[in-house]
Amino acid sequence: MISFGMPTLIELNSLEESAALCRELGLKFIELNMSFPQNQLEKLDADELLRIKERYGIFYTVHLDEELNPCSLNSGVRQAYVENVLGVVELAKKLGIPTLNMHMLRGIYCTLPTKRVFIYEENEAVYLEYLRQFRDRVTEAIGDSGVKICVENTDGFDLPFLLHGLDLLLESPAFAMTYDIGHDYAINCADKPIIMERAARLRHMHMHDALGTKVHLALGDGEMDLESYLRLAEEHDCRVVLETKTVAALRQSARWLYGRTV
């Protein structure tokens, strides 16, 4: 069964305010975005999170820091990111957080006269080794808790090293997939075949409408066949974040979704 939730919204000043809106709209969870200052690991109080969770009858997922790079060539930076994720895993186990959403970064590139060359592309063996180390440490930490780290399509899996990295992560049962349908639509659904080939590992979805390359629209404001994605989410029991950027767009998306005034 699908569970619908909301993202961290910059207009809302506190988690309690977000939780109140989440309950008002009939949503089930809040995705805590760790790119926001209030959601840094050292600022997240497990007891307070639990209090809000119980008061409003919701749960949480986590969007890991969008700059997370466990493959950084700088060993200190790499270790810091890995330790951060391990800390989030421990928090997730305490609070029953089922999903940690993760981006895969392309890294830096060099612009040659005829093409871009990505550093990770030229050093794929190193990239994959660091990713393997990350996967194995996280898998051990997660154990049998049921927490999943879901890898999101963001800018596309068009670079071979990204696809190889995705499949390396999916070798572990601790990893699964997030399908961001709006971002995929903006690149002419280039990632859809990749997602569908691995659909058995689909657990999470970021849902927003799109009009051409304009994304994060309220549901119903774009041109996407949203019903087909809802069927896909239903088939795989996905948790679905209504990933708008404003409260107004979130309200509109909830109205569209439930067909009622909220």
Task: Place the predicted regions along the sequence by residue.
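N-terminal pre-domain/capping segments
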Residues: 1-93, 258-262
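Histidine-acidic metal/acid-base catalytic patches
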Residues: 1-3, 12, 16-23, 71, ...
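A cross-domain feature marking catalytic cores of carbohydrate-active enzymes
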Residues: 6-10, 32-36, 60-66, 102-104, ...
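Soluble or luminal CAZymes and related metallo-dependent hydrolases
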Residues: 14, 41-44, 80-84, 123-134, ...
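Hydrophobic "anchor" residues on beta-strands that sit immediately upstream
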Residues: 27, 59, 148, 176, ...
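Short secondary-structure capping/turn micro-motifs that flank functional sites
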Residues: 38-39, 69-70, 108-109, 158-159, ...
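Alpha-helix-loop-beta-strand connector modules within alpha/beta enzyme cores
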Residues: 49-67, 129-142, 226-232
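Active-site acidic/histidine proton-transfer and metal-coordination neighborhood
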Residues: 55, 74-176
